[in-house]
Amino acid sequence: MNHRISFRLMEAVSGDTLEVFLDERLSFKENFKMLKSLCEKDYTKAEVYDPYKKVFLDRNTSLSEFGFQGFVFLKLFL
């Protein structure tokens, strides 16, 4: 996981919405897996959504229905 993202999450409080920039060195699929793992493991009540499609990411979201435009928003419910 990107250390910058981890650090920002550690300082976040419940209800915060963080802008998360995707790692350009990773493929679309790798970025998707990284964000999905945030929701499923570290922050089980987090929601990630594409600001253009307004689709929330959870453990049932498939790669084909989710598109990234360079960044997403992560909202925490701790």
Predicted region positions:
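Ubiquitin system architectures
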Residues: 1-78
